[in-house]
Every structure is written in C-alpha cells, then in structure tokens.
Amino acid sequence: MKPLAYYEDQLLKDEKSFLKVTEIERLLSYAAYLLPAEFRDDQLKSQTITSILLLLHQFHTGLLFRKIAELPKTEQAILKSERTQYLEYFRKKNPSFEKVSELLYFLNISTFPIELVISKYNPSRQYDSVLFLESVKFLLRVHIMWTTGGDLPLSNPVLQRDFNVKTFIHLHKKYSNSGSAVVLKNSKKVVPRLNTVNSSLDFLQNRTPRLSSILPDEIFTKRLPNLRIFSNFIKVCRPLIYMLFMWHWKRKQKSSSLKVRPWGPWIVAFVFEVISQLIDRRCESATSSRQGFGLERRTNQSQFQHFVVWAFTQGRFYDEFTKHWINRSLSWVNSIPVFGKYLLLSVEERQKSLENYISSVRNY
C-alpha cells in the first residue's frame, strides 16, 4: 500500500520518529473528546474507538523497534529491556510465537467490542461467542506456555516502548549522521568512525555496564519446575472455566425462570486463583535462583492484581450486581437535608466513571 509506505517513511526518516509518533497519538486521543456525545456515551462506539487507538499505538511501536534494529547490537542492548529481550528470543526460536502473540493481543482488545456487536444484533448468541473467543485465547496462551517452557503469558504479549526516549533519539542521530558512522562493505554493519570513539579506558567504563544488560540466551531456555508450570496453567484455565460455567448457567436460565445470581462460577474462579498463588509461594524459593525470575514475578503480580480488580467488581456482572448494592446502600443519602441531593448526584457521577472503567477490565 503506497499511502502506508509513505506514512512509514515520513515517520522514520529522522531521529525525531518517537516524538512524531507520540504527538500523533496524543492528537488522536484529544480528537476522541471532540467527537459527538453519541460516540462517547454509546459503549460500542467508544470501545471500538479505543481498540483502534490501541492498534495504532502497537503499529507505531513496531515501526520504532524496526528503527532500533538498525543500530549495532551493543547499542540495541541499551534500549532493550529484559521484557523485550525475552520476547525477541522466543520470536527467533519459534516463528509462530510472534503471530500467536499478536493474535492474542488483538483478541484481548477486541473481545469486548465483538461481544457488544453480537449482543446488539443477535443477543441469543452473546454467550456462545464469548465462550468461543475465550477458548481461542486459551489455546493461544497454552501455545505460548509451550513455547516458553511453562512461563505465564504476559498480559500484553507484544513489544512495548519501555526504552529511554532521549537515548533512542541520541543513538539514532549518532548513527544516521554520515560524519560519525560508516557502513562496512562486507558485513554491511554500521560502526562509529574512529574519530568519534572515546579512549579505550573511557570506552570500557562507559560500555561495560551497558553490556551487562545483555541477557544470555541460557536464562530463557531453563525450564520451570513442574509445580510452577501447573500453577501457570491454572491461571490460564481460569477465564475459560469461569466463562464455561456462565455459559451453562445462561442456557439453564433460558429454559426456566431462574433469576438468582450464580455465585458458583465466581467461587470456582476465586478458588483457582488462590490455589495458584499458594503453589507460587511454595515454588518461589526454587525459582528465585532462575535468572530472569524478576520478569516472571512481576507478571504474576500484575495478573493477580488484575484478578483482584475483577473479583471485587464481580467481572462482567457489574451492572446487575455491584450497581444494585451500591444503589441500595446509598438510598438513605437523598434524605439528608440540603446536601443529600447534591451528594447523591456526585456519587452517581463517580459510579458512572466506575462503570466505564469496569467495562474496560472485562472478563480477565
């Protein structure tokens, strides 16, 4: 596509690529607030716009990493975090890892808009579609676990801009300047000219700490203990098991007048999470010696925090459960003289913003 190629060339032609990308995304985010109210109030339109902006953000991130790949490997190590090196290692090891990760990311940000579309035009198929999407995401996560030797899939399994902006601009400017760099004829490598290189002592002092950020491949090849793999598998199963129970409850509800809220799926999901956390604590001493364990520990913590948010807001049933009890608990506020009405309006506004947040959390 010529327009897309032209767009990429304009973004990547100089060292200000990152600033251009950030400015474009910021302008588009501001433009979303200028849309008519129907786009912001309508949940389907709002979620669709959010998903499109996230996809554009990830497209720009891919372009920036393409620019980083043009630098020498020693300079790339300055910009690439442990998380980035982890993803790139498995991308090289298994060609399907990148496609599976991108597909999982796309499904994560598009599941809720897809569900809204189906619930609007074919409500009877809403739970069937969500169960199908959760099944596909489950298979993708299991594939990632198999590729990485049992690691828990990252909540965002694609590259992120976790590098220093000033360093990125400085290095890009340094190696794009023909006066400070030269391309070797045989290897086509870009190296700095001799007159731009510091003395050997300065070079060692400046480069040694940077080279220490390069992680050897061996830290990613070591397999996790079986118990930790089982714990990660429980976490991967939890969303699918929860949705399977809810799908069964919905079918049962259609065939009878049952209107009682099902606590069973929530309790099962909570038990799954508690079991996995107990296993993690037991295996922590065994895995703490594994290099790169910090990334796995941060992943487990973020997954658990996400689960806590979902658990306390009752997941996808916020509207019919949490909202009901909030309204009942605040029914007395309106009876307060003078300030009661204004306080109730303030609480309702806060509740509306909470609803919008919970709808973005979805069912994971």
UniProtKB/Swiss-Prot annotation:
Q: Which UniProt keywords are listed?
A: Membrane, Peroxisome, Peroxisome biogenesis, Phosphoprotein
Highest taxon of the lineage:
Eukaryota
Topology in the lipid bilayer is annotated as: Peripheral membrane protein
For biological process, the GO terms are: peroxisome organization; protein import into peroxisome matrix; protein import into peroxisome membrane
Which cell locations does it reside in?
Answer: Peroxisome membrane
Phosphoserine-modified residues are where? Answer: S200
Does the keyword section mention Ligase? no
What InterPro entries has UniProt attached to this entry? Pex16 (IPR013919)
- GO CC field: peroxisomal membrane
| Similarity field | Belongs to the peroxin-16 family.
> What exactly does this protein do?
Involved in the biogenesis of peroxisomes.
Which protein are we looking at? Peroxisomal membrane protein PEX16
